[in-house]
């Protein structure tokens, strides 16, 4: 049995959270997973670790964690892997991210019985280009 955890960045704006939650609803409807949870890097609850723990409570063997980010960055290469207890692909010595916003993030690795499988971010995909074209048409009033 497989559970899914979608990871959003988190924001003070409620819309950001609602978007990730709506994507989770679609994944739950379209996929065949035991449960689909949502966790956030910062500024929103639940945390990534809380979402993974909740997913594990459903008794699954594997939890697939999917960053709902377009591309890799410090969060997907370093921060999320740390939270999952996985080896980060980003060396802290390479970190020029200090100028960026730093909120009080908990990097304590989550401890669950299930195997954690870490997926790639969304990436360049023709389906995303279709959405971009839809947004262009909407902006031009050509819906």
From Swiss-Prot:
One of its GO terms (molecular function) is nickel cation binding. Co(2+) binds at residues 9, 75. Its EC number is 4.99.1.3, 4.99.1.11. Ni(2+) binds at residues 9, 75. It comes from the Archaea. It holds the Pfam family CbiX. GO terms for biological process: anaerobic cobalamin biosynthetic process; methanogenesis. Gene3D superfamilies: 3.40.50.1400. Belongs to the CbiX family. CbiXS subfamily. NCBIfam families: F430_CfbA, PRK00923.1. This is Sirohydrochlorin cobaltochelatase. It comes from Methanopyrus kandleri (strain AV19 / DSM 6324 / JCM 9639 / NBRC 100938). The gene is cbiX.
């Amino acid at each position: 049995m497989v559970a899914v955890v979608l990871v959003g960045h988190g924001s003070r704006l409620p819309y950001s959270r609602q978007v990730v939650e709506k994507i989770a609803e679609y994944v739950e409807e379209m996929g065949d997973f035991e449960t689909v949870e949502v966790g956030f890097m910062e500024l929103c609850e639940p945390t990534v670790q809380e979402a993974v723990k909740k997913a594990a409570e459903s008794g699954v063997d594997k939890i697939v964690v999917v960053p709902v980010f377009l591309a890799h960055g410090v969060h997907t290469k370093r921060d999320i892997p740390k939270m999952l207890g996985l080896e980060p692909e980003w060396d802290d010595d390479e970190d020029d991210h200090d100028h960026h916003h730093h909120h009080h993030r908990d990097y304590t690795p989550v401890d669950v019985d299930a195997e954690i499988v870490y997926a790639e971010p969304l990436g360049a995909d023709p389906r995303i280009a279709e959405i971009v074209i839809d947004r262009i048409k909407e902006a031009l009033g050509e819906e």
